[in-house]
Amino acid sequence: VLIIAVLFLTACQLTTAETSSRGKQKHRALRSTDKDSRMTKRCTPAGDACDATTKCCIPFCNLATKKCQVPTFP
């Protein structure tokens, strides 16, 4: 009887662990998709408003005018 009880408890633990890991895997997939959507964020075109956190399509955000601009060299 004791052996049967030990086997039953072991089986319950394995089943619970398997179910829990599936739930976590779904959670990871959602997190991964969210990260991918943040990485594919579009850039702000030249002439549009920007700030220190804006990703301009061109490499420069003029914080004085708050517009995405191409840098001018003298």
From Swiss-Prot:
It holds the Pfam family Conotoxin. InterPro entries: Conotoxin (IPR004214). GO terms for cellular component: extracellular region. It comes from the Eukaryota. Expressed by the venom duct. Disulfide bonds join 43-57, 50-61, 56-68. GO terms for molecular function: ion channel inhibitor activity; toxin activity. Keywords: Cleavage on pair of basic residues, Disulfide bond, Knottin, Secreted, Signal, Toxin. It is found in: Secreted. Residues 19-40 are annotated as: Disordered. Residues 18-40 form a propeptide. Residues 1-17 form the signal peptide. Its main location: secreted. The presence of a 'disulfide through disulfide knot' structurally defines this protein as a knottin. Belongs to the conotoxin O1 superfamily. This is Conotoxin AbVIH.
